[in-house]
């Protein structure tokens, strides 16, 4: 059966299926307690007097495969919202467990901390936020996504 399917599907279709399966394996719903602990630690780092937004917070404005005219990039979302790093930090401090979506393994480095995904409503639009604490000891936060959601999200495990 697999041989027939492989003969019928194009290489592109196979790649898409493989990516989808890999993504499904990398997703999980963390317990309510785990999400609460993550949010407490995130807020603790941000509220620490030693936290320096320019040294301790990184954001990926544009991924390699994104085009400049893509409305769903972090860079273009920030422009449309008239946001800077301080606004992102403010929104991270305001995250609630009810806005949690899922937890993802960092596929580029499975041994690094996981990404935590949230959807926050800003100016009547859903904003997709994917963030991790890179290092608790060094107090580093990495936000890989802060952009308008490409699709409406309605599945909030604790919302």
Language-model regions, residue ranges each:
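Short, positively charged and aromatic/hydrophobic N-terminal segments
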Residues: 7-10, 14-20, 59
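Compositionally biased, intrinsically disordered low-complexity regions enriched in proline and serine
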Residues: 13-14, 84, 101, 159
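Enriched for short, Lys/Arg-rich terminal
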Residues: 133-159
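Tryptophan (W) side chains
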Residues: 2-4
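Functional cores of ribonucleases/endoribonucleases
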Residues: 93-140
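Compact soluble domain cores
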Residues: 24-112
């Amino acid at each position: 059966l697999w041989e027939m399917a492989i003969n019928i599907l194009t290489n592109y279709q196979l790649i898409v299926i493989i990516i989808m399966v890999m993504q499904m394996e990398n997703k999980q719903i963390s317990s309510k307690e785990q999400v609460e602990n993550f949010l407490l630690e995130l807020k603790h780092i941000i509220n620490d007097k030693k936290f320096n937004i320019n040294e301790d917070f990184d954001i990926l404005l544009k991924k390699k495969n994104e085009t400049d005219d893509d409305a769903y990039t972090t860079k273009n979302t920030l422009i449309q919202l008239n946001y800077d790093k301080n606004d992102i930090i403010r929104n991270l401090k305001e995250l609630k467990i009810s806005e949690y979506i899922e937890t993802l393994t960092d596929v580029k480095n499975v041994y690094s901390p996981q990404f935590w995904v949230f959807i926050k409503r800003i100016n009547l639009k859903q904003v997709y936020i994917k963030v991790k604490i890179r290092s608790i000891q060094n107090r580093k936060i990495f936000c890989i996504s802060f952009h308008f959601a490409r699709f409406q999200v309605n599945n909030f495990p604790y919302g």
